[in-house]
């Protein structure tokens, strides 16, 4: 399949917004702000920026290089550079990882849609116990979560079958600006609440006394996972880049957008939480239990405004989830239609149906039945563990070794400098990082997940 009939991004802004949309996800909302607030505020953010420069951006550029050079799905892109060696299996690992993540990530994405519906219907009003029970009852229901998982897959499927320009790029040009507009509206509303300044201070006041080994390790982990490295998304989208795309500048712009969304999410969450004396947590419980309670209390005197803010928040989450799901879906769609030599619609249908089945089983494992739990862990949690803690760091680690030590330096330099049309002053630094620094940092991230450093 040639590059001409694969499609490509039609504009620079479309390329940036689509790829940034793949990186921006629910983790920007439920993980980064909490981590920043707990681990030194602006001090953590500075450490995180350093981690992005040392690890996130070099890894992203590496996947850009492999993807654009291959001009094909992720597995084939690695195969083209591997010359028949075992390195090709790194590409297949990324496709497999993306496939598994697509299935269970859609479950949480479906929860966001359910909460949009619940906000519209006013179902989230009540005391903290009611809201907590609402989430528990919904997530363990055998029907509704599966229904919403299928719903978000159908939305994603509709985008994907329209191709790169007519689907992914066109949708991203709408959804990413909408995401920022919604973020800004909620940030303004939250910051106007009484005692909101305490929440802003919690997030942004630098406390360098908290900066220790764990802060550095957590910042490294966040910078790695937030860039969507190791799951094929970056490599697949890069296969649609033109030869004129500046890979370093694109990676820098995407990382800035990703950080900006995360910081704005913190400015949305903490002022509202502190205004009612609630201590925010992280993970799904933050967005599906804590924040509905915060909105109920913070806007108790203005129920209509509270209804609007709650609705906008879950629309925002749904948009963030959908842009990530689109990139994951495309990893697998491009793989199936190119490797099986079928059209895009058939490839997308294979992904939608198979991943919806995976999602259904993952959803059912969260309380509807105990037959989908193994060794005390639900199937959903097993998918999260295997992909997040093993496959992603392994794929990232091997990609650094592959590009840094196996792929001919001239190929890497040609891609980095757009075949000599860019000066490429930073190429030497990039190559040093990807050969010697990034593999070590990813290995530290891997060990830290298992509590090796305490």
Feature annotation, model-predicted:
Residues 2-5, 9, 169, 173-322, ...:
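Membrane-embedded translocation segments of transport machinery
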């Amino acid at each position: 399949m040639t590059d001409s009939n694969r499609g490509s991004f039609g504009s620079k802004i479309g390329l940036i917004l689509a790829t940034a949309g793949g990186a921006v996800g629910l983790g920007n909302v439920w993980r980064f702000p909490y981590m920043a607030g707990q681990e030194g505020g602006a001090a953590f953010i500075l450490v995180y920026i350093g981690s992005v420069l040392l690890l996130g951006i070099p890894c992203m550029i590496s996947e850009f290089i492999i993807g654009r050079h291959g001009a094909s799905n992720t597995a084939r892109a690695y195969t083209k550079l591997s010359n028949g060696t075992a390195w090709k299996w790194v590409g297949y690992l990324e496709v497999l990882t993306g496939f598994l993540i697509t299935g269970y990530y859609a479950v949480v994405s479906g929860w966001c849609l359910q909460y949009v519906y619940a906000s519209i219907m006013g179902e989230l009003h009540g005391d903290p116990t009611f809201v907590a029970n609402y989430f528990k009852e919904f997530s363990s229901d055998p029907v509704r979560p599966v229904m919403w998982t299928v719903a978000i897959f159908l939305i994603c499927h509709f985008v994907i079958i329209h191709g790169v320009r007519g689907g992914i790029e066109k949708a991203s040009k709408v959804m990413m600006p909408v995401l920022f507009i919604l973020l800004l509206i909620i940030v303004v509303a939250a910051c106007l609440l009484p005692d909101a300044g305490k929440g802003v201070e919690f997030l942004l006041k630098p406390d360098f006394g908290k900066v220790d080994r764990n802060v550095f390790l957590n910042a490294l982990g966040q910078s790695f996972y937030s860039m969507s490295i190791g799951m094929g998304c970056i490599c697949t989208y890069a296969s649609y880049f033109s030869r004129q795309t500046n890979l370093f500048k694109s990676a820098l712009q995407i990382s800035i957008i990703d950080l900006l969304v995360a910081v704005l999410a913190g400015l949305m969450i903490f002022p509202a939480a502190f205004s009612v004396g609630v201590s925010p947590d992280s993970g799904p419980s933050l967005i599906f239990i804590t924040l509905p309670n915060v909105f109920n209390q913070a806007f108790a005197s203005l129920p209509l405004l509270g209804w609007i803010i709650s609705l906008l928040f879950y629309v925002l989450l749904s948009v963030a989830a959908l842009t990530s799901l689109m990139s994951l879906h495309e990893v697998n769609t491009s793989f199936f239609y190119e490797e099986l030599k079928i059209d895009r619609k058939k490839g997308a249908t294979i992904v939608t149906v198979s991943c919806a089945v995976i999602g259904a089983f993952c959803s059912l494992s969260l309380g509807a039945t105990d037959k989908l739990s193994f060794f005390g862990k639900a199937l959903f949690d097993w998918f999260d563990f295997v992909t997040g803690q093993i496959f992603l760091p392994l794929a990232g680690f091997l990609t650094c070794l592959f590009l840094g030590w196996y792929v001919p330096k001239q190929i890497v330099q040609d891609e980095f400098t757009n075949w000599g049309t860019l000066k490429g002053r930073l190429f030497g630094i990039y190559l040093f990082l990807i050969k010697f620094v990034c593999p070590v940092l990813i290995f530290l991230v891997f060990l830290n997940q298992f509590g090796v450093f305490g």
